[in-house]
Curated annotation (Swiss-Prot):
Taxonomic superkingdom: Bacteria
Provenance organism: Sphingopyxis alaskensis (strain DSM 13593 / LMG 18877 / RB2256)
NCBIfam families: recR
UniProt GO molecular function: DNA binding; zinc ion binding
Function statement: May play a role in DNA repair. It seems to be involved in an RecBC-independent recombinational process of DNA repair. It may act with RecF and RecO.
InterPro entries in the record: DNA_Rcmb_RecR (IPR000093), Rcmb_RecR (IPR023627), Rcmb_RecR_Znf (IPR015967), TOPRIM_dom (IPR006171), TOPRIM_RecR (IPR034137)
Protein name, UniProt field: Recombination protein RecR
SUPFAM superfamilies tied to this protein: Recombination protein RecR (SSF111304)
Residue ranges of domain Toprim in the record: 79-174
Zinc finger (C4-type): 56-71
GO terms (BP aspect): DNA recombination; DNA repair
UniProt keywords, alphabetically: DNA damage, DNA recombination, DNA repair, Metal-binding, Zinc, Zinc-finger
Amino acid sequence: MVSTEIEALVQQLARLPGLGPRSARRAVLHLMKKRESAFAPLLAALQTVSERLVTCTTCGNIDTHDPCAICADPRRDARSLCVVEEVSDLWALDKSRLFPGKYHVLGGRLSALEGVRPQDLSIDALVTRVAAGGIDEVVLAMNATLEGQTTAHYLAERLEGYPVRLTQLAHGLPVGGELDYLDEGTLAQALRARRPVG
């Protein structure tokens, strides 16, 4: 039997995505065995991020600075904008290092079942960014789900009439698949094979 404090830590870790009770228990045991080399640095990193965490007012990414590191990077191609549903999608795509541009996070996807409407997402901010000019291409990188494709179709309608080339990730992506669960090779192929919308 373990103390209530250790059990509380296991329960907190088990609440994280991808960690069940067994994995959380193993993680806690590892942290306790490697107390000096693992526990203290993890605690310090969590504390630092917790204190400095902000949402980028330009793109919606989560970082410790505003604007985020991607928006502030002058080497990024500001003429190319990739629209994603969630921050996890941005991180998955950016990890592939194949998209040289900047991003825009919607904060979800349209869903009649879940009651998510256009005004619940960062769509107006996207239209404002495009209307401001300087963007040549908008890549709609929605998940290959019914809601994702509905969102992409809605965005294509909202951006119609602006002088931008609309492209969409190729659908070698599995239907029903989510970007943050895909391997880098699949994401790379989808980015390379993007095609015009409509």
